[in-house]
Amino acid sequence: MLNIESNSSVDNKDEEMVNLPSDALRISPDSLTVDGGQRYYLNDNLFTGFSCQYEGDLMIFEIQFQNGLKNGVSRFWHNNGQPKSMLTFKNGAVSGKYKLWDEEGGLVEEGTH
């Protein structure tokens, strides 16, 4: 598995971060279930940690959850390893800074929701 920092040079110094510990649980999205209210569960418990999807050794996305809701910064990568998007979630909804990159790693758009 790759460490998030080794996958790209996504700048996160000004992002609103949820302070999950560096050893927080990291699982495949297939391990989670979701209810109609968009709350995510692991073994019938509200999930706190990271959901990460890989293609081979390359991370495709990393989504933060806190108490079953997307909360904090979520990152997505193009299949070539370049950053694709960074979205900030608060209580399950996109809220805060976002950035979008093209397949060559060039910043296409950034803003705040």
Task: Describe the role of every protein-language-model region.
Residues 1-113:
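Glycine/tyrosine- and acidic-biased, solvent-exposed loop/turn segments at the edges of beta-strands
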